[in-house]
């Protein structure tokens, strides 16, 4: 038995010392002559040493050592040799897959931190396929783990639905469908669309204020006191929504979501949000125009679906303190998270006080800053002068002519 144990001991150096000499294996008539190593105790350590070498790809020759022994006796003496084989290259191969798995890229932290986000991301190809549209706020949505703008869009829809995956998927689908049908980017493109100045001039503006150490502060202004004829401005709800969406798209472009280089902290601050100001100076609240009510409700319905988590805060300025009921009504149509962002201010000149000094001074004077008025310092959508077609009034003929015409009939 000792002699039999010696053969695997000798087999270890065979690939290194005897492979160049092709004649030596034929000169070993017996296992006794071919096993000069005297200490059988080395068999087990040697076998143990070959297992890790198989993982590295170098131990695969150990089980093949008995093959060069041509004598049948050597083959018989090598009977214990299968034991290293039973140390099994297969498990070694299995072990080799473990380092391979470790080499795979680790799952992004934003997926491990928010499992629902990963599930939402996995559903994205189906959502895009079903809606037939892949653009959201200027971001081409991609099923790529490293595409940060796409991840941020998904985070906004998921946050807007308090982590409810089904609700987020449903809202994203509706928003994509709306964008496909209305093409809001084109609505904001001055080369493609412009809006009736007699209805919308002075009604909406956009300003962007630079902040030190932070991104730009984007503000949209809705000056309802500038409306001359409410029935004309709000009477055509479809036209009003298009104008309002065009203004919103200009603001979204200023957020630069498509250029994002960092993922939004799901539980933290979102830097890709804007401020909205609604000015009701000279607007009567005693009797709300029904067209205004209808347009307001439709705007809330569309924007709450198509533009979630883009609003940081909304200020209602120059609103009489007794008109608190208006905000109670608005809160019925928006979720609780959005409702918390509403801030009524009775005096518009106090608006700038809500912001840091470096930004506040850049506001127009009417709102507590030192900048010129919005008309001369802000941007707006493309407007056009639309000439009203004069309706020709029927000429009044003499009574005799009218009687003659009636008889002729």
UniProtKB/Swiss-Prot annotation:
CRAL-TRIO domain location: 199-375
Membrane topology: Peripheral membrane protein
Subcellular location field: Cytoplasm; Endoplasmic reticulum membrane; Microsome membrane
UniProt KW keywords: Cytoplasm, Endoplasmic reticulum, Heme, Iron, Lipid transport, Membrane, Metal-binding, Microsome, Transport
Region named Disordered: 1-107, 366-409
Main location as per UniProt: cytoplasm
GO molecular function: metal ion binding; phosphatidylinositol transfer activity
Claim: Endoplasmic reticulum is one of the keywords in the record: yes
Catalytic activity, as annotated: a 1,2-diacyl-sn-glycero-3-phospho-(1D-myo-inositol)(in) = a 1,2-diacyl-sn-glycero-3-phospho-(1D-myo-inositol)(out)
Cofactor: heme b
Compositional bias per record (Basic and acidic residues), positions renumbered to this chain: 98-107, 382-409
GO biological process assignments: Golgi to plasma membrane protein transport; regulation of exocytosis
SMART domains: SEC14
Biased amino acid composition, Low complexity: 29-54, 62-80
InterPro entries associated with the record: CRAL-TRIO_dom (IPR001251), CRAL-TRIO_dom_sf (IPR036865), CRAL/TRIO_N_dom (IPR011074), CRAL/TRIO_N_dom_sf (IPR036273), Sfh5 (IPR042938)
Highest taxon above the source species: Eukaryota
GO annotation, cellular component aspect: cortical endoplasmic reticulum; cytosol; endoplasmic reticulum membrane; plasma membrane
Pfam families in alphabetical order: CRAL_TRIO, CRAL_TRIO_N
Binding locations of heme: 224, 244, 278, 280, 314
Similarity comment text for this entry: Belongs to the SFH5 family.
Function text: Non-classical phosphatidylinositol (PtdIns) transfer protein (PITP), which exhibits PtdIns-binding/transfer activity in the absence of detectable PtdCho-binding/transfer activity. Regulates PtdIns(4,5)P2 homeostasis at the plasma membrane. Heme-binding protein that may play a role in organic oxidant-induced stress responses.
Protein name per the record: Phosphatidylinositol transfer protein sfh5
């Amino acid at each position: 038995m000792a002699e039999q144990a010696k053969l695997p001991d000798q087999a270890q150096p065979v690939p290194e010392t005897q492979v160049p000499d092709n004649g030596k294996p034929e000169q070993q008539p017996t296992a006794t002559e071919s096993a000069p190593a005297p200490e059988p105790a080395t068999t087990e350590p040697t076998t143990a040493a070959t297992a890790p070498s198989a993982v590295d790809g170098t131990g695969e020759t150990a089980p093949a050592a008995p093959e060069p022994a041509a004598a049948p006796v050597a083959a018989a003496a090598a009977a214990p040799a299968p034991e290293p084989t039973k140390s099994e290259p297969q498990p070694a191969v299995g072990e080799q897959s473990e380092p391979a798995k470790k080499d795979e890229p680790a799952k992004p932290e934003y997926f491990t931190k928010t499992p629902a986000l990963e599930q939402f991301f996995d559903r994205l190809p189906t959502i895009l396929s079903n809606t037939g549209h892949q653009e959201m706020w200027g971001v081409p949505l991609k099923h790529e783990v490293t595409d940060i703008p796409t991840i941020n869009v998904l985070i906004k829809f998921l946050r807007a639905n308090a982590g409810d995956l089904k609700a987020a998927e449903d809202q994203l689908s509706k928003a994509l469908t709306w964008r496909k049908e209305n093409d809001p980017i084109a609505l904001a493109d001055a080369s493609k669309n412009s809006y009736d100045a007699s209805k919308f001039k002075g009604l909406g503006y956009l300003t962007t204020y630079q902040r030190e150490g932070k991104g730009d502060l984007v503000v949209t202004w809705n000056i309802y006191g500038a409306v001359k004829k409410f029935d004309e401005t709000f009477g055509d709800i479809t036209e009003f929504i298009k104008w309002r969406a065009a203004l919103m798209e200009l603001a979204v472009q200023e957020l630069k979501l498509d250029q994002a280089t960092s993922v939004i902290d799901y539980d933290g601050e979102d830097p890709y949000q804007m401020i909205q100001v609604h000015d009701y100076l000279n607007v009567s609240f005693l009797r709300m125009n029904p067209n205004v009510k209808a347009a307001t409700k439709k705007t809330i319905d569309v924007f709450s679906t198509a533009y979630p988590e883009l609003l940081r805060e909304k200020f209602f300025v120059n609103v009489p303190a007794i008109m608190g009921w208006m905000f109670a009504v608005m809160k019925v149509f928006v979720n609780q998270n959005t409702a918390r962002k509403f801030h009524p201010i009775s005096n518009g000149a106090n608006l700038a006080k809500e912001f840091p000094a470096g930004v506040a001074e850049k506001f127009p004077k009417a709102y507590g800053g030192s900048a010129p008025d919005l008309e001369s310092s802000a941007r707006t959508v493309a407007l056009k002068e639309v000439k009203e077609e004069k309706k020709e009034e029927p000429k009044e003929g003499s009574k005799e002519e009218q009687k003659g015409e009636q008889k002729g009939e």
